[in-house]
């Protein structure tokens, strides 16, 4: 069957369901203007007809003729007498129904009211044995019921339909009867993200999932529809999966062409299954037991035994409620104090307390059993032996405390209850055995109250209370203003919860005061109680009595008496023995559950920030210890953190890669350094040197030192060559007596004139005498000139490219092929490519990564959390031995101790000559806080990268999501794009990770089943509720102290709590490449690593034909202002001429500069302004507008701001860039020094040649 309903409607919305007619309605159409004739009915039938007419006017707008014979069949009572008396109650009933809406205590919200209007028509209850198990919904032309909901639809027409079942969608479907099609609701496949409506309020739809606040839905809601604001059905609820604060719904919904079923992990079906209990091998519904001993007030002891027999059944609490309220197949009126009824089957008790406030032990009526401190807001949940909020009769009384005084239950005023640590605590809530109080830090805990005689009863235990605050600030007082962070707290509600405590039958309480000596006889005074006695004098002096009894010829020391009472439960305390060895028990709900809430935490005062050159100075003013941390956003994060508790000043180095710092609970701040410096790149030599020294001090010192050394060497060499030439010129004349130096040589060498052979004569002599030497003399100066020319040429050729070396691998504006490109995996870094195609105008393609997400494939090994040691009440075998039996409990320990002689407040517990034995048990279980506070151990596998990329070309500007794997194709504006795989196989996650709340840790952990005591993983389970709990806590039992009933044990401290203290910094604060670590699901966001290859197929339709595009001519560029190393700090004006106005693609064809604009509007003989970003001081880049190209040349100045809160949008440099002015000065210096050197070389060569000729 097709599970997509057909939209069949009859022009109606939200109309009430027609009333049930006691006759069969004829389905033949009748004329609209004809009014059927009715015979005169009786008064009751006349009233019914009036009601039917009113309803029909609201629904079908037609009147239907009722057959006479069938109308007389439908009478609720067959009696025909006293018709006038029947009429009066009917009128009275109608009068009572009018004010009924005003009597509602809780008015439904707008969403609930809207759903109630629609649901009144389109949903029907599904019942099994009279109990509602779910709902069926009329959608379109079909009736749909979840297949897992057992029962029959509560409508005779729908119940007899033939349904077809689909296990794939968990639905049963049938065609709606024709006369009910007007009741059906519309449906829609349109589901924009937002909020929708259902029976319990708002439903949030996001990411393809429907979620509700936890607790808003429950079993029994299966089949309820979800509506949009127009009243159309968008989904049908099947179940839910608890995910902490919210519950994900399992639904059947529709897309445009098909039906889909959304089933979150851990989904439970929400069918209200009928719970069955047993009694004497007979099954019965737990909510309505048919047996006689099912009311506690009538037969308390038998009722408790029945509850103990069903304690492990799912319907136990329904049976408990039915037993306490004594309802048996009858309507029960609920009460706001109904959950207190269970306490009438329990009683307070006296228990051993080591310190009753005065340093001595006692059996205290307010003994402290447990203290829980899982809430980080300083709240404590304390369990005591007294019961609060109840009077001594067991009824609810908020101002009373009932406690055990001997064998009797007494009551006192609740106002006298006190809780202390280092100071008095503030009590926020009390119920039964539990107190919720906010306490200051301290080393002990004390609970006290005044009894009926105004005597203080107290108990004091050693307890270290030092709550850890939420967030990154250790504050003490809740602030007036701050930020809300997720946390846990004890909810102040006494309604039933998921937590529970075990109860058991109390033991026999020995009391020596019941025995009195009278003339050699022992008298047992019952006092209205049941006494179990045992006397060793005589025979058969063992038994129970409820009246006074005398044991003849006996002494008190030979008798033992104890009060026995098995019609009440009491808490399973390790300080009170249990009545028998069998594990018979009951259980009751625990109030004040731990729930997820938000806590207001303070915001540290913002630090005083001073920006310097590549550093930032923070002056911190903490009001309390505050965490300060920072990390680098590059490949090496170098994380740092410390707790600051006084005024401090911290200097953080800032690089071009960026840093992130966080102060207290303030949001993290990211900063990037800019290439700021003193001096000018286009000024005098000393200004240029100052400019480059500020940017690259080491390289500048090396370059200036090298240039200075070269200049000095060149000058020294020039002087040396000139001196050598002079010496060679004067030497012949100095050795020849009476020689006269020629006039020219004398002027050059400052020497007397002399005669010598001319150059021509010298060369002629060498030609005649030695031709080899002649050619050597001629070749030497020529070789020197050639060598000098090559050096100068090489220097000029090397220096010019030196000013334009950039990181080409991250080019954001490089021209790409038509079908391939490589974009940097950096969020916000624009990539632009110029695409040319024959016959079309060039087009600029822009790709920008908006968001990236690395999601590893995770395999949950186990969860671990804090454990609790469960210590049942010990079993004491008087005058005999007992044996341990194995139990399927984690880390179960059992020991039997002989030779024990326990005492209770009324005397010795045992009375025999042989030894007594005590059976002590203990085992480990998950703490109640595990649902909210646990760590998950995962094995991480290959991470997949998902990216959100903004694609712009032509008139298309769209953002799309794609998996970067080289296979997933996305379609944007008719173009096909395939991204990936990424250039580097990298992931911030190790093979083993631990997830705790919103933090992720790269940490090794033991495998499942191999935990060590006191370490992470000492307890392990697959989920927080699974039955596969493993524990290794080195739990050990010890021998009880003489005369005391207790179960001493020594557990190893929780490994989970130890791990919380020693876990160190999370990956959130030290991930490389600026990754933002998120959970649910675990992922790393916006990691700036690697490059993403892109394959694309762009159709011709995306281009503009040449004949349709403007023809741009006379394009010229003038740079108005330019600031390099700043985000689009350059402004250029492009002047042009064109034949017609239109849009043109503008693009930079060089990696030196990145343009901000992709397209511009051109007009005839106009100008356009573009912005560009560059890292060069003297950029020269080619710009094209449509088909025209020109070159822009700029002289850029350094930025003024040292630190900015955004990253650069241009390419970084590998080597220092040299400005055009600096190159000019270098060329001038090289030319001057080179000229001097050339002159010296020429002179030396000429002199050498002349002297060698002689």
Swiss-Prot record:
Name the segments for region: Transient transmembrane before p62-6K protein processing. 729-749
Residues flagged as site, Involved in dimerization of the capsid protein: 196, 229
Q: Which residues form the active site?
A: 148, 170, 222
Q: Where is this region: Ribosome-binding?
A: 108-122
Gene Ontology terms: cellular component: host cell cytoplasm; host cell nucleus; host cell plasma membrane; membrane; T=4 icosahedral viral capsid; virion membrane
Q: What reaction is this protein's catalytic activity?
A: Autocatalytic release of the core protein from the N-terminus of the togavirus structural polyprotein by hydrolysis of a -Trp-|-Ser- bond
Renumbered residue ranges of the record's region Disordered:
60-113
- Position of motif Nuclear export signal? 153-163
Residue window of motif Nuclear localization signal: 70-108
Q: Which residues cross the membrane?
A: 695-715, 772-792, 794-814, 1232-1252
Lipidation annotated as S-palmitoyl cysteine: which positions? 719, 729, 749-750, 1249
Instruction: Give the keywords, sorted.
Output: Capsid protein, Cleavage on pair of basic residues, Disulfide bond, Fusion of virus membrane with host endosomal membrane, Fusion of virus membrane with host membrane, Glycoprotein, Host cell membrane, Host cytoplasm, Host endoplasmic reticulum, Host Golgi apparatus, Host membrane, Host nucleus, Host-virus interaction, Hydrolase, Ion channel, Ion transport, Lipoprotein, Membrane, Palmitate, Protease, RNA-binding, Serine protease, T=4 icosahedral capsid protein, Transmembrane, Transmembrane helix, Transport, Viral attachment to host cell, Viral attachment to host entry receptor, Viral ion channel, Viral penetration into host cytoplasm, Virion, Virus entry into host cell
Which ranges are annotated Basic residues under compositional bias? 84-110
State if Ribonucleoprotein is listed as a keyword: no
Cite the position(s) of the site with description Cleavage.
Answer: 270-271, 334-335, 756-757, 816-817
GO biological process per UniProt: fusion of virus membrane with host endosome membrane; proteolysis; symbiont entry into host cell; symbiont-mediated suppression of host toll-like receptor signaling pathway; virion attachment to host cell
Q: Which GO terms of the molecular function aspect are on file?
A: RNA binding; serine-type endopeptidase activity; structural molecule activity
Give the residue ranges for region: Dimerization of the capsid protein: 192-202, 228-232
Region Interaction with host Mxra8 receptor: list its residue ranges. Answer: 360-363, 396-398, 518-521, 550-556
Give me the ranges of the annotated region Host transcription inhibition.
43-77
Instruction: Please give the InterPro entries that the UniProt record associates with this protein.
Output: Alpha_E1_glycop (IPR002548), Alpha_E2_glycop (IPR000936), Alpha_E3_glycop (IPR002533), Alphavir_E2_A (IPR042304), Alphavir_E2_B (IPR042305), Alphavir_E2_C (IPR042306), Flavivir/Alphavir_Ig-like_sf (IPR000336), Glycoprot_cen/dimer_sf (IPR036253)
Give the note.
Belongs to the Old World alphaviruses that usually cause fever, maculopapular rash, arthralgia and myalgia. Structural polyprotein: Translated from a subgenomic RNA synthesized during togavirus replication.
Put simply, this protein is called Structural polyprotein
